[in-house]
């Protein structure tokens, strides 16, 4: 009953946001770099923050430093959706938020170089998740797969977080998917959505890694990770400015050049990540070997795909 109520309230909150976005003209206009062709409401992913906030308010204010950190990145990302902000301003907010999350993790008791490594890895993951938000359904669907896996691990393998937190966030993702996981999306996540859900997943996976002292759990993000890293390497090889927008991710080639429906591409990413997670949990005793094997296999698929289809890409 609790989750049904949360689901209804989040659904109503999303509808209320749509009215605000429509009235304030918070929209995403298609351009030559877009994978969509119609004007669509932007920022629907703010519902992820509301999901985390709902848990915070009903749990006796659990994880306060994390919630404050999430509020910071959500705020600056929403502002960026409305009016572009400077890179230094965004970095200041993101680094401040990550410092708070590290404090919630208890990371400051470790050596300083662990903190530096964590900062680099976390920054990379958030940016990658943001870059991968380019077609209908991919952010919501991929996040749903990871959250479902985390819920299973939390219940059956090792308890690393309050279960209600994961389930409440899942409710928010389901609401977003209702409006986005379709041929003609009602809304896009926006930076506020992709960054906030990335931050939430990062917090959960970070707690899991700290609890188990096993970094191989990063396999939960392997599909996004390989696509993001190899696309950056590819663009560097092409002597491009990696800070500029583009349409060279594997999923973008599938959706734009091969004309595969967005929902099908998103389902493909979800399915591959699901299979990897199931395999990892089954062969968990070989965690790092499995992780390396997945990275190599996904990298091979990426390279072969690009060799065959990248020539169709129109810059």
Task: Name the predicted role of every residue range.
Residues 210-315:
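C-terminal membrane-associated helical module and adjoining short loops/tails
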């Amino acid at each position: 009953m609790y989750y049904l109520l949360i689901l209804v309230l989040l659904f109503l909150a999303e509808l209320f946001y749509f009215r605000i976005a429509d009235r304030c003209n918070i929209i995403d206009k298609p351009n030559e770099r877009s994978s969509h062709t119609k004007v669509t409401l932007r920022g629907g992913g703010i519902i992820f923050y509301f999901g985390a906030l709902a848990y915070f308010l009903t749990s006796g204010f659990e994880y306060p430093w994390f919630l404050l950190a999430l509020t910071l990145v959500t705020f600056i990302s929403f502002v960026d959706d409305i009016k572009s902000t400077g890179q230094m301003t965004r970095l200041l907010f993101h680094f401040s938020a990550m410092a708070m999350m590290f404090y919630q993790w208890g990371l400051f008791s470790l050596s300083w170089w662990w903190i530096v490594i964590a900062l680099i890895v976390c920054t990379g993951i958030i940016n990658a998740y943001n870059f991968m938000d380019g077609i209908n359904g991919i952010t919501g669907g991929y996040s749903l797969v990871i959250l479902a896996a985390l819920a299973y691990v939390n219940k059956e393998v090792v308890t690393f977080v309050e279960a209600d937190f994961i389930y409440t966030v899942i409710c928010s993702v389901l609401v977003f998917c209702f409006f986005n996981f379709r041929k003609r999306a009602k809304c896009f996540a926006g930076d506020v959505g992709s960054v906030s859900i990335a931050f939430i997943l990062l917090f959960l996976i970070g707690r899991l890694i700290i609890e188990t002292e096993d970094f191989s759990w990063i396999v939960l993000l392997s599909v996004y990770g390989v696509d993001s890293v190899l696309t950056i390497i590819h663009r560097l090889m092409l002597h491009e400015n990696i800070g500029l927008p583009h349409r060279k991710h594997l999923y973008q080639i599938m959706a734009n050049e091969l004309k595969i429906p967005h929902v099908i591409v998103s389902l493909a990413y979800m399915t591959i990540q699901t299979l990897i997670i199931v395999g990892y949990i089954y062969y968990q005793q070989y965690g790092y070997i499995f992780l390396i094997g997945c990275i190599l296999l996904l990298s091979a698929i990426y390279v072969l795909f690009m060799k065959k289809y990248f020539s169709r890409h129109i810059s």
